[in-house]
Structure formats: C-alpha cells, structure tokens
C-alpha cells in the first residue's frame, strides 16, 4: 500500500523539531522509530489529561500490532484517536478564544487529525507492518512537532 507522506500543517519552529525524528532535509518526515516502544517523558505536553491520552494512543497502536486482524483492537484504537482528538481540539479552541494560540495552527491541527482518522479508517481490520509503522510514526511526529506547538498555550 502506498502511504502518503506524513505532513505538517505549518512550518515547525526549530525548538519543536526533535533531532532524533527529523533528518536534515525535512521538517516532517521522521526517521525510522523502531527503537521507540512506549510513551516516555520526552513526549510530555505538560497537560496531564492530554499526556495520559497520548500514553493511551501508544498503547492502542501496540495492541493493534499484538492482535493482528482483531477488529476489536482496531475499533478501540480508532475510538481512542477520535476521542483524544476531540478533547485536544476543545482544549486548543479555548486557547484560540483566549488569544494564546494561533487560529491558523488550530485549523491546521484539526485538518491533520481528520486526515489521519480518514486514513486509519481506510486501513480496515488487517493492518500490516506498513500501516502499523505508519500509524506509530504519525503519532510520534504529531506529538513531537504539532502538539508541542501548543505547550503553555492551552486553557484548562
């Protein structure tokens, strides 16, 4: 399956570009992340509810991998992503309304969420290595770049 490149909705400022995930030619294409096996402190956005949800997203992707072909695991992952995106977007909207977060970033962030949900849904129940690796790379890239942009800018 030809998967699309992992896209960013805006230029990522250098402080948010994680050197282990990006090569010198791109802001958005992560290097292979097979060395990552779980959420760790380097993924903290410093909002407890969002950090907890991010941990859970790692868990559901690994669960899909462990239970290949299990429709329940895929459905649980899709629900976890959708639920997290709903929570995160609501928190971000408050930041936009308070003037702490840029509206263009918010819109781009929501677009990235929607594109991922659409793509994940298109995978069906039998995710192979490519789809699972893509999902994990997308998650890592999204947290380390796109989500890091809102640190300190949300109203809870």
From Swiss-Prot:
GO molecular function, one term: iron ion binding
Binding site for Fe cation 2: 88, 109, 113, 142, 147
Binding residue positions for Fe cation 1: 54, 84, 88, 147
Pfam annotation, one family: Hemerythrin
Source taxon at top rank: Eukaryota
Keywords: Iron, Metal-binding, Oxygen transport, Transport
UniProt-listed InterPro entries: Haemerythrin, Hemerythrin, Hemerythrin-like, Hemerythrin-like_sf
The protein's role, per its UniProt record: Oxygen-binding protein. The oxygen-binding site contains two iron atoms.
Record-linked PANTHER family: BACTERIOHEMERYTHRIN
Family designation: Belongs to the hemerythrin family.
Name listed for the protein in its UniProt record: Hemerythrin-like protein
Lineage of producing organism: Eukaryota, Metazoa, Cnidaria, Anthozoa, Hexacorallia
């Amino acid at each position: 399956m030809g998967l699309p490149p992992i896209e960013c909705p805006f230029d990522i400022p250098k402080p948010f570009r994680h050197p282990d995930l990006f090569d010198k030619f791109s802001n958005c294409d992560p290097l292979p992340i097979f060395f990552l096996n779980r959420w760790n402190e380097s993924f903290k956005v410093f909002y407890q509810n969002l950090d907890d949800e991010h941990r859970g997203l790692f868990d559901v992707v690994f669960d899909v991998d462990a239970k290949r072909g299990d429709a329940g695991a895929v459905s649980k992952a899709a629900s976890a992503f959708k639920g997290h995106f709903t929570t995160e977007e609501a928190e971000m909207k408050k930041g936009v309304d308070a003037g702490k977060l840029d509206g263009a970033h918010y819109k781009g962030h929501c677009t990235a969420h929607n594109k991922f949900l659409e793509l994940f849904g298109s995978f069906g129940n039998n995710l192979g290595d490519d789809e699972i690796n893509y999902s994990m790379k997308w998650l890592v890239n999204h947290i380390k770049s796109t989500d890091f942009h809102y640190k300190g800018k949300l109203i809870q």
